[in-house]
Amino acid sequence: MSSSDSIRMVLIGPPGAGKGTQAPNLVERFHAAHLATGDMLRSQISKGTELGLQAKKIMDQGGLVSDDIMVNMIKDELTNNPACKNGFILDGFPRTIPQAEKLDNMLKERGTPLEKAVELKIDDELLVARITGRLIHPASGRSYHKLFNPPKEDMKDDVTGEPLVQRSDDNEDALKKRLGAYHDQTEPIVDFYKKTGIWADVDASQPPETVWSAILKALGKN
């Protein structure tokens, strides 16, 4: 890898694997930008940029935003977002081989090729237990877990005593469908990065601090 405190990587992992915990750690440690494709899309649309307007038109018609628009959005961030000076953590992209190839070509043209693709791996059954047990206090956003972090009183917020709710998309069948789709989509991407020699996997079933150490080790930064 290049200079000791820059980073150019893709973060891969299913819902609930801890990307939301680890991405901020990476941002803080490397002063790099966390480029989550959903956030980027929303930002470009709200700013009314040309790319944002193109994307909005497609989305309003129920279509999927093209690979070219997504790659150009990433290029735009790399060019105009000062936080990208020390590198980037791409999250949610690429999801297909053509996307991975287009991304690679664009990054190589800029002279900033990817250095690592880190996959957070976790057993589906464990993920389902993790996610379906999540309980939320809607007003404050405080979250609990039936198994790992239960409230003092069943289904009640510790601070206010108000009822807790379970997110509707956190139910088991919906989650298993999402995980099935995730694996179908991700396996070819993992193979692609294995072939290019930049892939590394991390066991995401461990406690967050252990996962963090393993990510740094995978990046050669421990």
Curated annotation (Swiss-Prot):
Statement: the UniProt record of this protein carries the keyword Transferase: yes
Q: What is its EC number?
A: 2.7.4.3
Cellular localization per UniProt: Cytoplasm, Cytosol; Mitochondrion intermembrane space
Enzyme class, top EC level, equals transferase
Q: Which GO terms describe its biological process?
A: ADP biosynthetic process; AMP metabolic process; ATP metabolic process; DNA replication initiation; pre-replicative complex assembly
Q: Looking at the record, which segments are called NMP?
A: 36-65
Q: Name one GO molecular function term.
A: AMP binding
- Classification via Pfam families: ADK, ADK_lid
Q: Which residues bind AMP?
A: 37, 42, 63-65, 92-95, 99, 167, 178
Q: How does it assemble?
A: Monomer.
What the protein does comes down to:
Catalyzes the reversible transfer of the terminal phosphate group between ATP and AMP. Plays an important role in cellular energy homeostasis and in adenine nucleotide metabolism. Adenylate kinase activity is critical for regulation of the phosphate utilization and the AMP de novo biosynthesis pathways.
Q: What is this protein called?
A: Adenylate kinase
State the organism of origin.
Answer: Candida glabrata (strain ATCC 2001 / BCRC 20586 / JCM 3761 / NBRC 0622 / NRRL Y-65 / CBS 138)
Gene transcribed to yield this protein: ADK1
